[in-house]
Design a protein with these regions (language model features):
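Conserved kinase catalytic-core segment
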Residues: 1-49
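C-terminal catalytic region of ATP-dependent kinase domains
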Residues: 30-151
């Protein structure tokens, strides 16, 4: 779930929020579960549709601010370790995405009516060093205030 939260911060996904997870949990044999990510129609930040800059999702809109996150992340020490491990991999994940960007964009359904070419500049922003640093800082902050030190 931490990967999903970081992904949402990176893309500024406003569609998955503390009260609209857009996730399905399926129980499988052996007491395990599979988490499915669903409903990605509104994954792109609403500022993408307008002549605005990319904006981070708010802490209130982050899945890290959900009851589900509070339930899943009970062990502060383990959560911090997982966060640090994930952030070490974050540049690799984003580079992999950038390397495969055209293939990924080709999979965006036509029915979403997104003119990807007109959003190229904003899409390119998510790969900049500044944006990645902002996302890392925001992710750490949201974990600290929404999970570790939640009132």
């Amino acid at each position: 779930m931490l990967k999903i939260a970081l992904f949402d911060i990176w893309l500024s996904n406003e569609d998955r929020t503390f009260n609209n997870y857009n996730l399905l949990l399926q129980a499988i044999k052996g007491g395990f579960s599979i988490l499915y990510i669903i409903d990605n129609t509104e994954i792109f930040n609403s500022s993408m549709a307008y002549d605005q800059s990319m904006e981070l999702i708010t802490q209130d809109d982050s899945i890290l601010n959900s009851k589900l996150a509070t339930f899943v992340f009970k062990n502060d020490t383990e959560t911090v370790r997982e966060m640090n491990d994930l952030l070490k991999e974050f540049p690799i994940f984003t580079k992999n995405c950038q390397d495969n960007l055209q293939s990924i964009l080709n999979q965006v359904p036509q029915k979403w009516h997104i003119d990807l070419q007109s959003h190229k500049t904003k899409i390119d922003i998510i790969f900049t060093e500044d944006w990645l640093k902002i996302c890392e800082h925001t992710f750490r902050k949201y974990i600290q205030t929404s999970i570790i030190h939640k009132p």
